[in-house]
A protein has these predicted regions:
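Short, compact, well-ordered microdomains
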Residues: 102-143
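Short, charged/polar N-terminal "headpieces" of proteins
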Residues: 12-67
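UBC/E2-like fold recognition across ubiquitin and ubiquitin-like conjugation systems
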Residues: 11-14, 141-143
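Generic secondary-structure boundary/loop-capping signal
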Residues: 1, 82-84, 138
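Short coil/turn linker and secondary-structure boundary residues
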Residues: 2, 17, 27, 105-108
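Short acidic, low-complexity intrinsically disordered linear motifs used
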Residues: 1-12
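A short, structured beta-strand/loop element
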Residues: 45-111
Length: 143
């Protein structure tokens, strides 16, 4: 509880150029509480993976099961660098065509993420549908 700040203290700690930037940051911070990140050491991938359930309040419900991968190979979490990708036998990046040029990682790294999703599809879908806990997810994930 000691990390809770008043709104004006929060604003003073940050450097926002616009109100939209502030609102997007607050939204993103709230979203983070509802997502679990999976490190490169756990997945064997070059990128950090983010998982969430379909009961995420801040983002609304999605029809298509998805995870997100970090759009770089940094070991530091960068929440503004997340790319959604479907959980399926043939995972698809869920960006509009004109946004695909924003992808910074290599095609080989994207293919590795897709193979990892296929290998872990069952447990990822169970987590998406809230049929398993985060602890169980981490125990059952395969590299």
């Amino acid at each position: 509880m000691k990390n809770i700040k008043k709104f004006d203290e929060f604003i003073d700690d940050q450097n926002y150029e616009t109100m939209d930037e502030l609102l997007n940051t607050v939204y993103t911070d709230e979203m983070l509480l509802e997502m679990a990140n999976i490190s490169q050491n756990t997945t064997g991938l070059d990128v950090i993976i983010w998982v969430q359930t379909n009961n995420t309040q801040s983002t609304g419900k999605h029809n298509l099961p998805r995870i997100k991968f970090q759009n770089n190979t940094a070991i530091k979490i960068q929440i503004n660098e997340l790319i959604p990708i479907s959980i399926s036998d043939n995972p698809k990046i869920l960006l509009k065509n004109n946004d695909l040029n924003k992808i910074k990682i290599s095609q080989a790294q994207i293919n590795a993420v897709k193979l990892w999703i296929v290998k872990n599809k069952e447990i990822l879908i169970d987590y998406w549908n809230e049929k398993t806990t985060t602890d169980e997810l981490f125990q059952k994930l395969k590299k």
